Amino acid sequence: MQERFAETEFSHAMVPLAVGNLTFRNRILVPAHTTNFGVNHLPSERHLAYHRERARGGVGAIIFESIRVHANSLGRPQAVCGFDPACIEPFRKITDAVKAEGARILGQIIHLGRQVEGDFERTVSFGPSPIPWATSALPPRPMDRADMDAVIEGHVLTARHLVAAGFEGIELQMAHGHLLQQFLSPLSNTRDDAYGGSAENRMRFPLEVLQAVRAEVGRDFCLGIRLSGDEYVEGGITIDQAEETAAALAAAEKIDFFNVSHSAYHASYSLASQMADMAIDPEPFRSLPARIRIALRDEGHDIPVFAVCRFNTLAEADAIIAAGGADAVGMARAHLAEPAIVNKTVEGRMNEIRTCIACNQGCAGMLEKNLPIRCLVNPRAGLEGEWAELAATGAQQPKRLLVIGGGPAGLEAARTAAERGHIVTLWEKHQNLGGQFRDAIKMPKRAEFRTLMEEQIADLGRFGVTVVTGKHADAGSIADFAADAVFLATGSIPVRAELAGGGKAFTIVEALDDPAALGSDVALFDRTGEWAALTLAEHLADLGKKVTFFSPAGGIAWRTTIYSTLANLKRLREKKVRIATLRKVTAFDGKILTVEDLSTGESELHMGFTGLVAAEHNFADQSLFQQLRHLDVPVRQIGDNLAPRTALEAVYHGHLAARDL
């Protein structure tokens, strides 16, 4: 058994914190994050199981996700409302469960403003001014006095319901480009009345909301603000302005905490930074809470300030608190990946932690599709009420399992089955485990996949999996092994584009392995819309090559999240990668590239390219599966062997297969 860390190891993060009338047992919190678990706009049993498990994992406080204050702020079927009294009873179940585990429970209340175009509820969206959040969006209705009063009343009513439901605190959402931030920002507020123009005027409506909620909940109830420290868009809120806003709000009304984030819902890098993926360095964002904390104290306001954005470990959280950069740290995605990260760290069980890698595939990626959030590294995320923890699912009759293939799916299946008590052997034809993870980590800005790969491999040893590398599997060797069950995780086969002209089209992997063979001027044709082509383009540009990115679609990266796409576009633009959409490469003879303009049907001839990379979807490798049909042993295909998809699906199906065994 591993030795428990003394709390002095995390002497800043693991000490209590007074926040208004509350005391958090430690300074780690789960900040508000949308889950899409709502049912009929009410909190669900799925919410209950999800938050109870994270409270049980040792966190100091949980802030429940964006609770809508008005019907025209719902936006999606799974959004949770607070203005309907029907929310009180299901919320009470959640608050009781979280408090029973020793954590504090707060709720964030929100109006989304112009982000909601009203398609779902057939309502009119509100905003300070008729300025859409993106070129593809619709302008909101500029709010009049009656609209403002309705939104204030919605905040007050929601606060009343949350207090009745047992919430111990409320956070007003003035960040991330939602309605109250839209009033604060000169980018979205161009009014010429008392609610626009000067900083004081732009703050007027958010302050009215704050004062109305404070009057409803009373002076002794914990009430705080989530604030963007910087919008990261020209003409928007800067950190200097955010400092002034925080100090002015604190001078005007009692505020018990500031939760400092950044960004706005703006179709630019601003939005990309909001859920910064593994390609984005989080360090610049971590200066924002420190700046606001200093500004508040300079004005005599000793108010706790929370920091957020890609804190993956308690050590990182402890360091920023120790340095005076924040009083507490929010770790949303880290808790999605590992609900017990606090307890496991303090108890010295670091090798059991599933570390967030900021891939954003299961969290942001699912939100964009209006689906419940998931997690690549934690397939159980969001299924806490349906899937018991593995420790409680021990095999009644251990089976002898043979897993063939040591990529994302095979590694997950092997470690999960072994943890449940099965006798597991894994064969891998290569000398190294990892499969497509090993290709991914060659890419710039994708190296954090190594963390997951190494954690999976370490678990093979921890749970006693027998690993044989350099092992070729065929029907005979599998039959001789005499397993009780076989999982095929042999992956997929790269497809080489068939083009006229006779010139070679490199695959993504070939280009990664031998970029010099492409020469200095590279054409990259992507049919997949996935990460690999994007990161290869950036990698080749980093090597000093001229890169032209051809896409048959109207844009690029249609299968990555908008957050990541916007960040990628910024980097590709900075590295002078040329992007040509609605273009299909039809021929290459080594010198002349023929491209069809899909908008006109005409062909274009491009001279000077020294190499071509064609990104195609892989095909499942079915060859071994066909050989095993005659075996009197259950054979289950998992990962890309079942169907080529993302690592999110590969890991999930590997985990699911092991649970089903």
PLM-predicted stretches and their roles:
Residues 301, 324-325, 463, 482, ...:
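Short, structured coil segments at secondary-structure junctions
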Residues 60, 168, 256, 327, ...:
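Conserved acidic residues
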Residues 395-427, 433, 468-480, 489-560, ...:
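Rossmann-like dinucleotide/flavin-binding elements
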